[in-house]
């Protein structure tokens, strides 16, 4: 996906975020650090510091959502003041790209994702990390896509996110495809499995839709 973004004319930075035994809020901290790192190097890398989108797919979508909805949270106060030495606004994404994202810790949760990110702190933080409950008027715009047939991370996850964005009047594009399992990536041969699983040509249109959304929102 990062290579596809480069091909489309965007810069791409990949974060390999931590999982158990390293637990939340490490993922939020790592996302914030990465946002600062990109902005710090924006001039050298030819990046527009006002058009930085945080992207994530499946559990990665949850990490993207953590920063998109938590850049202004007190959870980041110590890190920003004493380690990164920057403001909350400096680590705010300008937008979010969420593909078949893990959003809710409620009835439609993908429990395994939360077990890996929370570890022994599961009971302590499970309510705090339900992304749809964190959306506020300062949450950045979002491009979201999902499939009806996703049995791993149910469609209800993105539906809850869209509903939360709508209530706060945050702009979003939302694309739901009729066919396709979880983890499709680009939906093309490049991200298909050896037996051509995860090959869904109709889903591959999401990249062009994303490009159009970028043009509308940020150019």
List each language-model region with its residue ranges.
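Short beta-strand/loop motif that positions the catalytic acidic residue
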Residues: 138, 143-146, 150
């Amino acid at each position: 996906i990062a290579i596809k973004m480069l091909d489309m004319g965007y810069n791409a930075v990949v974060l390999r975020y931590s999982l158990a035994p390293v637990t939340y809020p490490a993922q939020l901290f790592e996302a914030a650090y990465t946002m600062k790192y990109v902005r710090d190097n924006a001039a050298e890398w030819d990046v527009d510091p006002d058009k930085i989108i945080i992207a994530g797919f499946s559990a990665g979508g949850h990490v993207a959502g953590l920063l998109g909805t938590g850049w202004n949270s007190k959870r980041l106060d110590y890190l920003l003041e004493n380690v990164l030495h920057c403001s909350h606004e400096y680590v705010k994404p300008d937008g979010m790209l969420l593909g078949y994202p893990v959003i809710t810790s409620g009835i439609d949760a993908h429990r395994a994702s939360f077990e890996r990110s929370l570890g022994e702190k599961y009971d302590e933080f499970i309510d705090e990390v339900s992304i749809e409950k964190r959306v506020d008027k300062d949450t950045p715009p979002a491009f979201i896509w999902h499939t009806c047939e996703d049995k791993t991370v149910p469609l209800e996850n993105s539906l809850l996110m869209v509903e939360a964005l709508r209530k706060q009047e945050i702009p979003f594009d939302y694309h739901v495809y009729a066919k396709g399992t979880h983890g499709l990536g680009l939906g093309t041969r490049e991200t298909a499995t050896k037996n051509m699983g995860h090959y869904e040509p109709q889903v591959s249109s999401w990249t062009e839709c994303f490009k159009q959304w970028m043009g509308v929102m940020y150019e």
